[in-house]
Amino acid sequence: MGKTYSSPINPIPKAPKGLAIHHWLNFLQAAYRLQPGPSEFDFHQLRKFLKLAIKTPVWLNPINYSVLAGLIPKNYPGRVHEIVAILIQETPAREAPPSAPLAEDPQKPPPYPEQAQEASQCLPILHPHGAPAAHRPWQMKDLQAIKQEVSSSAPGSPQFMQTIRLAVQQFDPTAKDLHDLLQYLCSSLVASLHHQQLETLIAQAETQGITGYNPLAGPLRIQANNPNQQGLRKEYQNLWLSAFSALPGNTKDPTWAAILQGPEEPFGSFVERLNVALDNGLPEGTPKDPILRSLAYSNANKECQKLLQARGQTNSPLGEMLRACQTWTPRDKNKILMVQPKKTPPPNQPCFRCGQVGHWSRDCKQPRPPPGPCPVCQDPTHWKRDCPQLKTDTRDSEDLLLDLPCEAPNVRERKNSSGGED
């Protein structure tokens, strides 16, 4: 019987060891263009073949898919021949002169030109054979796997875009799915910038006209959520991907994104600093208000964030956020820090040591009384170590020792050498 393979946990199969991730993504994109779509067995055979081909690196530096095709054994199982054939066919298109903007634009790295796929099995849109298309929301394992692939890439970078394009091509998400994916992968600042650029692109597309778009049926975003509107869904996906190209600072966050509210700084002063920095640092034509609202909450100190969360104003107009945080000032914080714990009142009973009222026995400055009379003189007012009679006896014994006769040194040496007197 043939081998069976369980469904992969990661929606994007892992690259073979020794193969660069961008080369592996090219193989995956070619595999997803197969008709009918690739099976798990095809991916297994592709990984198995590439592990062997890496040991013969003549096709890697530079990469040459024609040489790689010659390394495929005859009657090799799976569809590795077809995948490599697609790569050979598309290689000239990706190496075209600069007149081809799709291949040379750093914001749009290869993928290959997307083609409509018929009756393909993809998620969250399901196309079961002989049944209408159905929608299935994202599963957390899918989102986690995609985020793991782009964790080391900045939003909008070539590596980030290549992975996201592959995920969109594989899963065929709706407009709502793309919104959820953006919120999961990117910060609130990046999501706000992307949303503004996407709204501009959608308005232009609706004005110019899109095949299959009906203005009477609602906005493009609503129509793209219909599982049966595959053409409009593809158009919306392209607009969603294109919106990443307008993100300022794809490699690192701009300077104004690092402005934080100090622990003692009033919220109004912090917002004013943000406003000035955005006026001086935002690219021309970029809307300022959504970025200012996003940073006013995300970069505020913990006290102000708690106030905004309690009132449900994390993304409210800036005036409402300022009024909400007026209840917190550094003076209020100092008052809270000056509150001291209540001290325990002194006892009403006399102290066990000195007999006075007003303090506890553990705080008494008088020495602790002895538990009983002195065993030497029977005096109950002192300890044995402080007995004057004991000190007198010790002094008398020392005086007696001083009165004893002392032998001369030569006599003592003579006794020691002879072993003592007879």
From Swiss-Prot:
MF GO annotations: nucleic acid binding; structural molecule activity; zinc ion binding
Task: Report the residue ranges where the short sequence motif PTAP/PSAP motif is annotated in this entry.
Answer: 98-101
| Bias (Basic and acidic residues) ranges | 388-398
Q: Where is this chain lipid-modified, annotation N-myristoyl glycine? A: 2
Under the cellular component aspect of Gene Ontology, which terms does the record hold? Answer: viral nucleocapsid
Q: Where is this region: Disordered?
A: 95-116, 388-422
Which keywords are on file for this protein? Capsid protein, Host-virus interaction, Lipoprotein, Metal-binding, Myristate, Phosphoprotein, Repeat, Viral nucleoprotein, Virion, Zinc, Zinc-finger
* Record SMART domains: ZnF_C2HC
Which InterPro entries does the UniProt entry name for this protein? D_retro_matrix, Gag_p24_C, Primate_lentivir_Gag_pol-like, Retrov_capsid_C, Retrov_capsid_N, Retrovr_matrix, Znf_CCHC, Znf_CCHC_sf
Question: What's the subunit arrangement here?
Answer: Interacts with human TSG101. This interaction is essential for budding and release of viral particles.
What is the protein's given name? Gag polyprotein
- Record the organism: Human T-cell leukemia virus 3 (strain 2026ND)
